Amino acid sequence: YTNVLIMPNTLPALDGQTVSGPEATGAKEVLDAGFDNVIDFLQQYDTAHDVQLPVRYDLCVCASKDRAGHEASDVADWLKYVPGFEDDAKTPAMLTHPITAISDDGSAVTPEILDQVLENVKASDLYLIEHCEHHDTGAVNEGPVSRELGVPGIPEDTELKIVARDIEAARRTGVHVHFQHVSTAISFEAIRRAKAEGLPITCETAPHYLALSDEALLKYGTLAKMNPPLRSEADRKATIAAIADGTVDLLATDHAPHTLAEKELGFLEAPNGIIGLECAYGVCHKVLVDGGFISDERLIELMSVGPAELMGHVPTDVAALVEDYAEPAPTGDDPDGVIAGERDAQPQREGVNRLLDLSRVDDADNVDLVVLNAAEEWTVDPEQFHSKARNTPFGGWQVTGRPLATIIGSQLMFSRL
């Protein structure tokens, strides 16, 4: 390969339901996507801790009971799962799958419980992951496309209102607020100003917001329906600008599997969301790196290092595991230089050859890596996904960059090598 990269692997947001068994489909698609650590939004903590999967996962506690928005969840019900609280009494599973955040993802925290939720965040030393949008009507972005489709629109200020409200809450309380799947230029500008002020604000966006505008609805139909909705082309460009200037701290998939039957119900009835795990790196690399907006290294920071640090994990230090490696000179066993000739005929990587040596780390159980071929061109084929879902607008896309292998705890868990 002309450009093989090694990165520590993690992902901050995998929305899902309870799964079980080491061969669970969800586990396969996580590994295929080049990720090993995810946040899953589940309320059944005891059940979740018993699930055995070949991936690492953290838990996110619901901000409200039953995620209904009427009453804040009770700290007494879940504090024992938070790192730093009653650690001596924790089971190994509880230590392995900690609660690292609070969220009502899918909905913004409602005004009537916001203050109590912020108190819970402070009491547990966690952070608030906020779905920064609130609206009661509408199905797609409000604008020319919604009018052409004859579908009720969602104004862009539905996102800004929650962003502005929660920035003020962070200013008032000192609570760390992390905004999910930000999609509008006006929200990015508000976040940019808040960060310049030194407030504890971070944010993410998703591959579809940097790759698609609401015009994709005309081509892909409900496969491009999501929440927040795809916005205007100007907002898409503003999303890329926010990634390039560092306003965006990380990229997440906002992975939301649905059946094609559900997606065929039409714009008003079809569920929001697309699957994103298995083509996330390729789509982001194609748009951001091939487009000249960021480097390969920065994309790794956005998809790996940043998410790990947000969740309170220390990413594997790849630099500590590599050493310069010199090709051996031809020996008497190759008097005609045949081996050397074959070697010289192979594509040569730029820069210094390096050897990855997992024996150089004392705690091999915590070595989590992904091998990436950043130069591989491939076509997204949903029929080849490990996921049972096929709801993606990226089918048929030509992208570059693909995970070749996923290593968890120094063990090869998935490989295309």
Residue ranges of each PLM-predicted region?
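Divalent-metal coordination cores built from histidine and acidic residues
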Residues: 1-135
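Short, electropositive alpha-helical surface patch
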Residues: 21, 26, 34-49, 76-80, ...
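Divalent metal-coordination and catalytic microenvironments
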Residues: 57, 102, 131, 177, ...
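Histidine/acidic residue-rich metal-binding segments in metalloenzymes
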Residues: 72-251, 331, 353
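His/Asp/Glu-enriched, well-ordered alpha-helical/loop segment
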Residues: 148-176, 223, 244, 250, ...
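A conserved acidic, glycine/proline-rich C-terminal tail/linker
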Residues: 379-399
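Generic C-terminus detector
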Residues: 393-417
